[in-house]
Amino acid sequence: VCSSDLAAAKAAGPSATPSAASSVLAKHRQELGTLASTLPFFAYTACFLLAPTVIVVVGAFQDRSGGFTLSNFNKMFEANTVAAFGTSILVSVASSVIGAVVGALASYALVIGAKPNGLLRRMISAISSVLAQFGGVMLAFAFIATIGINGIGTMLIKTLTGYTVNPNWLSSLPGLITIYCYFQIPLMIIIFLPAVDSIRPQWREACESLGGNTFQYWTRVACPILAPRFISAFLLLFASAFSAYATAAALFSQRSILVPLMIQGAMRNEMDPNQQGFAQVLAFAMIIVVAIVMLLSHAVEKRAGRWQ
């Protein structure tokens, strides 16, 4: 028996070697294919994300001649700069809270009121995907044409009720927050809908079988599971609103009440040559704020990942 096994092993040896070699070659080809498919993404990220970040960080510590300086940071703690950061944070927090709450309620209503693959679910998901990207000058123009000084909605309200809408409302902070909610709510639906989908009906049945009521189910089961994802989504909404520029620029063309608008004013300033460096400092500060928010979002997302 031993001699026959030895003979079989010797016979299988030469044929097994090419098979192992072919598997190694196939593995290398797969790795090369993966690298080739991801290379454009890394190139795009390096060109349009990493390189601008490096330019901003380096430029914040350079003077006009390219030497190292800290004078660009002198205006960071002036009253108008602090006010711009405070206003940006206020608008971002307010629009994010409204967008997160309304979007979460809409996601829950969509889960319990529509079939997973139904027409209503697909339509709302598609519309939310479009509206989440509908910002900038187009969004500002849409609101101006609707409820601006001579907007269709403004004229209709005046004709039907005699009430005249405040012509400066769109150029106020409540108006800006309302406009931001137009893309914050759909973005929240896209982000939070998978989290609500992950809640299993068996968990509620188990809670009820153990004598729990609806309040106990939400406070001890559903909310602890959804809270990390809700906080993570809120932080993403905050980062989105904090870095938004085009919509506010179309409404506040001559007022630097937000940090992105202050950066625009500093870049266009031709009277003070040091304003270019100050613009880099403002952008650097925005990068720090957004980076902190994204790190917090990632930490919360890791905790929520075990339930997905």
Where are these regions (language model features)?
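Short, small-residue-biased leader/transition segments that mark boundaries at the very start
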Residues: 1-3
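Transmembrane alpha-helices
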Residues: 39-48, 188-192, 200-201, 212-244, ...
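Transmembrane-helix boundary motif in ABC transporter permease subunits
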Residues: 95-128, 145, 298-302
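Non-cytoplasmic
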Residues: 52-56, 188, 229-264
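Interhelical loop and adjacent transmembrane-helix boundary motif
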Residues: 29-30, 75-80, 249-299, 305
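C-terminal transmembrane helix and the adjacent membrane-cytosol boundary/short C-terminal tail
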Residues: 7, 36-37, 55, 59, ...
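Short membrane-interfacial helix/loop motifs at transmembrane-helix boundaries
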Residues: 43-81, 146, 249-254, 308
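Membrane-interfacial helix termini and adjacent extracytoplasmic/periplasmic loops
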Residues: 27, 70, 140-181, 251-255
